[in-house]
Amino acid sequence: MSENNSVAGIFSGHGQIKTPTYKEQAYRLIKEAILYQRFQADTIYSQEAICQELGISRTPVREALLELQKENYIRFCRGKGIQIVSLDDQAIHDILEMRIYLEMAGAELAAQRATKSDLDYIRECLEANQRHHSTDNIIQNYRIDHQFHRSVAKAAHNALLYNTLDDVLNHYLRFETLTVYQSQTFAQSIVDE
């Protein structure tokens, strides 16, 4: 029986298995909290408090926050912490305008380039959207709806278009969830009176 301890090339093209780093996990959790209005816009949050809540050190949290700053979700307040960037009327207008343009371009390219498996996946997303549209879980509805829109963009086979639309959809999700949050807050204030 021959023994060969070399496995070089056996997994070529696949790379090493990688679990999400603390930075990636912090980025995902903080971004999700921003998108779903768990952070209040224009409120200053301590980086130290975020680190404690996540149970990780400052470095991965800081790296995640720097990335979120580049994406215009947060701003740093020198010596105080971070602040969630609020969506003003102009930002909302820009997001809506960009979404319309990107989705039109994506749909046109998808109509020309989509494979059978792309079309099957689009159909699955559309059916899921229709099944869940009547449920009371608004956040789940948004996720499913956005997955449908992402499936069309993915079928365009243009990575730049897909990535840009993905970013725009995330910013749009902030607007959608903010609207729901404000409606619920308003309704609760009426009930409380």
Where are these regions (language model features)?
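C-terminal regulatory/effector modules of DNA-binding transcriptional regulators
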Residues: Q182-E193
